[in-house]
Amino acid sequence: MDHSNREKDDRQRTTKTMAQRNTHCSRPSGTSTSSGVLMVGPNFRVGKKIGCGNFGELRLGKNLYTNEYVAIKLEPIKSRAPQLHLEYRFYKQLGSAGEGLPQVYYFGPCGKYNAMVLELLGPSLEDLFDLCDRTFTLKTVLMIAIQLLSRMEYVHSKNLIYRDVKPENFLIGRQGNKKEHVIHIIDFGLAKEYVDPETKKHIPYREHKSLTGTARYMSINTHLGKEQSRRDDLEALGHMFMYFLRGSLPWQGLKADTLKERYQKIGDTKRNTPIEALCENFPEEMATYLRYVRRLDFFEKPDYEYLRTLFTDLFERKGYTFDYAYDWVGRPIPTPVGSVHVDSGASAITRESHTHRDRPSQQQPLRNQTTSSERRGEWEIQPSRQTNTSYLTSHLAADRHGGSVQVVSSTNGELNVDDPTGAHSNAPITAHAEVEVVEEAKCCCFFKRKRKKTAQRHK
């Protein structure tokens, strides 16, 4: 009898020990550890919120096995216009061979949400544009342009069109990283296959399409309701290049009673602005670029090498060296805590996917162009550089630590007191109001800017 009881006690102790080991070593997706840490998959600890939008939110995360920071994009599983899985599929379609694409580490459920874990990158071109007093030199614009032509060529080679060109979607690498000089392309929530995967044929030309993209940069044909193709991505890039050189575009700041009227005015002004006037006082190559891409046929494959050569020849003729000495090099660049930039005043729109806050059919007050403080994400200070407090003071992270963050290696989910991923890591994920699905299950820009009051920053 005693022997039987001892065996029973031993089995109970063994079962309890195994359960404790399993609890420690194997965490289901989207569960919390005993210390209340929210996990995505077995590796990724969810940290503070660094962005949000109609379809979910962005969190800072950390890979507990490599000690590296990541970005975690969350979307409610029951979203009426889900796009995260489609974006993940596009990232996989693009693969990891192309330069200037963020690595995607994981996709899976996180409680009532789908989660995509991405490489954490540096600030966007819009942030850097602000840092450089909203004008880039010709050398910097040419180094950006040559790289982005290659990025877009690669995206197109994978049978995708991007459809959301804007400075907020192009990021440099993180400071101190070997890829810090590389311009990355992110956020494929509006991308579309322009080659039918079954027939292998180019999608047909159509008209009366809804606006998809960012009004400030989108092509003239997009304003006219024409189906987008490769030519439209390149025209939008050309508009962005001129934005960087000029500091603004002639169709910015137009007033109208409704958003629909405003988008109409933007399109009309683009059509009525001669390329020569848009590119006045800048090298002829800028006008040549825009003339070429605007003359492309809907089905035509652009000559990317011709366009790159246009800019590389100009670069060499000016005596520049491709040394990645951008205008922002040497300036106090804050260290970003998010790799997916939040929306600016030039918000992306799509009417073929859902009813959006910027949809022209909605009668709502127009937003004024956002200030630079609204455009920026949340930042940490990089103390190794001489900081300009007048620039940085109003742009610090809500959970700043007054200096570099010291991270202790951890694989057990325990939080170091100085770890930014520990801040509000188990805070509830707030789902935003659902939107009406109109046509395709795609979203427009994933993140909205959130203004943070000074008092909130110091909480």
Curated annotation (Swiss-Prot):
Bias (Basic and acidic residues): 1-13, 351-360
Alphabetized Gene3D superfamilies for the sequence: Phosphorylase Kinase, domain 1, Transferase(Phosphotransferase) domain 1
Binding of ATP, residues: I50, G51, C52, G53, N54, F55, G56, E57, L58, K73
Tissue: Expressed in both the striatum and the neocortex.
Pfam family name, one: CK1gamma_C
Catalytic activity: L-seryl-[protein] + ATP = O-phospho-L-seryl-[protein] + ADP + H(+); L-threonyl-[protein] + ATP = O-phospho-L-threonyl-[protein] + ADP + H(+)
Record-listed Phosphoserine modification sites: S344
Molecular function GO terms recorded: ATP binding; protein serine kinase activity; protein serine/threonine kinase activity
Chain intervals for the UniProt region annotation (Disordered): 1-34, 351-388
GO biological process, one term: Wnt signaling pathway
Mod. after translation: Autophosphorylated.
SUPFAM superfamilies reported in the protein's UniProt record: Protein kinase-like (PK-like)
Family of this protein: Belongs to the protein kinase superfamily. CK1 Ser/Thr protein kinase family. Casein kinase I subfamily.
Stated role: Serine/threonine-protein kinase. Casein kinases are operationally defined by their preferential utilization of acidic proteins such as caseins as substrates. It can phosphorylate a large number of proteins. Participates in Wnt signaling. Phosphorylates CLSPN. Regulates fast synaptic transmission mediated by glutamate.
SUBUNIT field: Monomer.
Record-given protein name: Casein kinase I isoform gamma-1
